[in-house]
Curated annotation (Swiss-Prot):
Name the record gives this protein: Type II methyltransferase M.PspPI
Transmembrane segments: none
Membership in a protein family: Belongs to the class I-like SAM-binding methyltransferase superfamily. C5-methyltransferase family.
Organism annotation: Psychrobacter sp. (strain TA137)
Key words, A-Z: DNA-binding, Methyltransferase, Restriction system, S-adenosyl-L-methionine, Transferase
SAM-dependent MTase C5-type domain mapped to chain residues: 77-410
Alphabetical list of InterPro entries matching this protein: C5-Methyltransferase, C5_DNA_meth_AS, C5_MeTfrase, C5_meth_CS, SAM-dependent_MTases_sf
């Protein structure tokens, strides 16, 4: 159910504070949170007045989002992007004010998408290990990349740059070494921060520092704070060349004023001017569509009648555990779950809130905050994959504006 702008559901409170709905219910029972009283509303919302005592809500209610989005580059800032995919990160950075000079991507369908939308972009379609970046040495302001993180063996030793040879981490580090950009932005799954107790990330950070960079930011960003209607989380690493460390100061972007929902993505409103256009998409087999019709909005397999739940889950039904992604239907009034490379995968179901079908490709794109005129190339499966792997455009925009502000504030000699 949709509440007034100064009222928030338990689900939105939980998402914002990174706690479970059960936590919110417990706080309500012990008086830490007191929902608004309205006999006409079954689900009692929480008000702005009591939520602003939480740091996350206070930051939203007192945000400088509009002022930060209004900042324009004071000079031309150049961008190189690695592992560019379908262009979510590059597009957001373009909207922030960066000018792309080179994008590298090996997937032919993603490259076709990039060229269809930005014919003027210099898209290098090749494996990154075949690309020479030395001609850009000292000429690039920002290098970015969402590098796929492959496992590497360290066997108790302290690894350096050459020890990572053969991995995509090495190739991104090589590009940084050859280009020597003023700033780099690396993004990855949030799990990288916890992999091997943080050892993998520590090795990557050390290699980047050994190449002559200081880390300004190393944090997991929640996309819901940056005008993205999706519970996506990404590890963001921002580094600056050591000789510029005392001249550049990064400040994390302010959050958007509210958490957007699936309804904001698919219906006309503050995110899009019109309802989502029709587009291609996968369909369920007839029996699966029948089964999903029993799942209520926001529900999952545990909401199925017991007989149907056993049929659908098979052996998994008896194994216990949450398995909350199975037979999962999205809710209109909550952000989407993190999009994956296919909306109909059994373990990570992404069913439309009110229709018994997977999300279409354009619905997928909207939840990732791509504009409706961004055209994707390839088969339906390839398009889902491109969108599911992308950085949300609005998240990239927010980070890009923060980097623009940092560069604008730098002394002139940084660019001489």
């Amino acid at each position: 159910m949709k509440f007034p702008d100064n009222h928030f559901s338990a689900a939105i409170v939980a998402d914002t504070l990174s706690v479970s709905k059960r936590n919110v219910e417990t706080w309500t029972q012990n008086g830490k949170l007191v929902p608004a009283l309205d006999p006409n509303i079954h689900e009692k919302p929480y008000t702005k007045d009591q939520l602003e005592t939480f740091e996350q809500f206070s930051a939203m209610f007192n945000s400088s989002w509009c002022e930060e989005m209004a900042v324009e580059p004071s000079r031309s800032y150049s961008l190189v992007e690695l592992f560019a995919g379908a262009g979510g990160l590059a597009l957001g950075l373009e909207q922030a004010g960066f000018k792309s000079v080179l994008l590298n991507e090996k997937d032919k369908y993603a490259c076709a998408t990039l060229r269809a939308n930005r014919p003027n972009w210099n898209v290098i379609e090749d494996d990154i290990e075949n690309v020479d970046f030395t001609h850009l040495n000292g000429k690039v302001d920002l290098l970015t990349g969402g590098f796929p993180c492959q496992p590497f063996s360290y066997a108790g030793k302290q690894l350096g740059f050459e020890d990572l040879r053969g991995t995509l981490v090495f190739e991104m580090a090589r590009a940084i070494k050859e280009i020597k950009p003023k700033v780099f932005l690396a993004e990855n799954v949030k799990g990288l921060a916890e992999n091997d107790g943080g050892r993998t990330l520590s090795i990557i950070i050390k290699v980047l520092e050994d190449l002559g960079y200081k880390i300004l930011e190393k944090e997991v960003y929640k996309a819901i704070f940056y005008k993205v209607p999706q519970k996506r989380e990404r590890l963001i690493i921002i580094g600056v060349r050591t000789d510029l460390y005392d001249k550049l100061a990064y400040e994390k972007p302010s959050p958007y004023y509210k958490v957007l929902t699936v309804a904001d993505a698919l219906k006309a409103g503050e995110l899009y001017d019109v309802d989502v256009p029709e587009s291609t998409g996968q369909l369920y087999p007839e029996r699966k569509a029948e089964i999903m019709s029993y799942v209520p909005e926001g529900g999952y397999w545990r909401d199925l009648p017991i007989r149907i739940a056993k049929e659908y889950m098979m052996k998994s039904f008896y194994l216990g555990g949450g398995k909350t992604g199975m037979a999962r239907r999205l809710s209109w009034d909550e952000p989407s779950l993190t999009l994956v490379c296919t909306p109909a995968q059994k373990q990570t179901e992404r069913c439309h809130p009110s229709e018994s079908r997977p999300l279409t490709t354009r619905e997928y794109a909207r939840i990732q905050t791509f504009p409706d005129d961004w055209e994707f190339k390839g088969s339906v499966g390839q398009i889902y994959k491109q969108i599911g792997n992308a950085v949300p455009v609005n998240l990239a925009l927010a980070i890009g504006k923060a980097i623009i502000r940092m560069l604008n504030a730098a002394p002139k000699d940084v660019f001489e």
